[in-house]
Amino acid sequence: MALSRLMIRDFRNISVADLSLAADFNFLVGANGSGKTSVLEAIYTLGHGRAFRSLQSGRVIRHEQPEFVLHGRIEAGNVDARATSVGLSRNRLGDSTVRIDGSDGHKVAELAQLLPMQLITPEGFTLLNGGPKYRRAFMDWGCFHNEPGFFTAWSNLRRLLKQRNAALRQVSRYQQLRVWDQELIPLANRISEWRADYSAAIAADITATCAQFLPEFRLDFSFQRGWDKESDFGELLERQFERDRALTYTASGPHKADFRIRAEGVPVEDILSRGQLKLLMCALRLAQGEFLTHRNGRRCLYLIDDFASELDTGRRRLLAERLKATHAQVFVSAVSADQIRDIPDEKGKMFKVEQGKISLQSEV
């Protein structure tokens, strides 16, 4: 699976771009502020319905323009398979239109299914040293792409938790919450089981990849479901009713789950250097993408912003070799071509980005 064509209109500082893309490596080279990260963000938005640098739609629409428009052509990688066209537009009011093969009315989740991707940015350390929500997102990405019923269950869980938290401000007895909990409890257990199963299944891939990237450390991974593992979730909700009512939110549940990572028994953020943390982040993203390939034959896109950040020459070369081994489509941004010369025998296309203008510089 690869994007063979990308069209961008009025996104960030890019007025218009129509790019024919390589199935392997695509390099975006330009000075800071030139727009190379905007290209990566356009691809990410096409597959997620939102940007990775801003949650506000208006901030990614080019100045004084009413909307942004993104289009892509997805090649399945099979000679006999038909290509799929996808599109996303959004105006300043936040109204979106998702198009697949020319028809409207589709959902962003359908784009995400068609375009699985892994993002590596200088801000991506939050996966390791940020709050649990970032690691829940890591697990949920895997569950979304491996469990057909996950997205519906996850959406219903969010809705029920929101309703339950609102009800906690109004009720005086637990019995008044049962209408929500009767639906919430089986959903919570199902989602927790999916996350636990996914965490256990991907552990071998993560361990093997981390052994290549950080052989000097013994790394341990553990899934925490968000409530005491010895407790029945339904009984816990009833037992913690007064506490939840005082807090006005549900204090325990799958929305509090975490995926903890330790090095030599210590939280990784307390022992690893910035360069080592980036390698670990890359290892996790690569392992997750490769697990998807092993499980169902689908390949991720890898988006890597500021390739050289935090990495010395040896580590850049190691990352490049592992990316090549995935046989996936990769997009890499760099300030100069010198920063990507560590990718051995690189094949693909190099684009020059300057003040929002994108031009093909070379093709190997």
Swiss-Prot record:
Gene name tied to this protein: recF
Transmembrane segments: none
Stored InterPro entries: DNA-binding_RecF, DNA-binding_RecF_CS, P-loop_NTPase, RecF/RecN/SMC_N, RecF_2
HAMAP family, alphabetized: RecF
Keyword Secreted on entry: no
PROSITE patterns cross-referenced by the UniProt entry: RECF_1, RECF_2
Stated family: Belongs to the RecF family.
Protein's UniProt name: DNA replication and repair protein RecF
Binding-site residues for ATP, renumbered to this chain: 30-37
Subcellular location: Cytoplasm
